Amino acid sequence: RESANPVLDWDTGKLLEYRQLLRDPKHKELWTKAGANELGRLAQGVGGQIDGTNTIFFIHKHEIPQDRLKDVTYIKFVASVRTEKDDPNRIRATLGGNLIHYPDDVGTPTADLLLIKIFLNSVISSDRARFATADLSNFYLMTPLKRPEFGRVKMSDIPDEIINEYKLHEKAVEGWVYFKVMR
């Protein structure tokens, strides 16, 4: 079975994914907090410790336009350990792009490999040249969509802190919580 970015349990040697980390008593507290932080970051914050980006808004299913119900996609949580970060235990939520039918361009323009090679060659061939890179935090989360997309997440995948703060028991339908994606 293939998996993306599982977390290694050093004691057992097993690779664990998000749902396994939440069920394992040894890992549950740490990774539940990481999951709450990610959902809070995507929404309107959580517990005063994480600011939200207003990327998603939890909604009632009936708020989804009828003609868009067929486009509701899923969310996948990816766990990883990034030892170089201040908070190394990371959960990232990704939407199932195979179910999104967004009418506008969703591509990310990038430079051609040949252009990059020419550019780097120019840098290393120039005396006293300097080179820098930058990482833009939450770059994609801050790009507004012209029309919202919709998704759903299993209630069992949502940490209690998020469920309580956003009153998701009131919005859940048959074990699912729906959300609107604005960015």
Residue ranges and their predicted role:
Residues 1-183:
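Long, low-complexity, charge-biased intrinsically disordered regions
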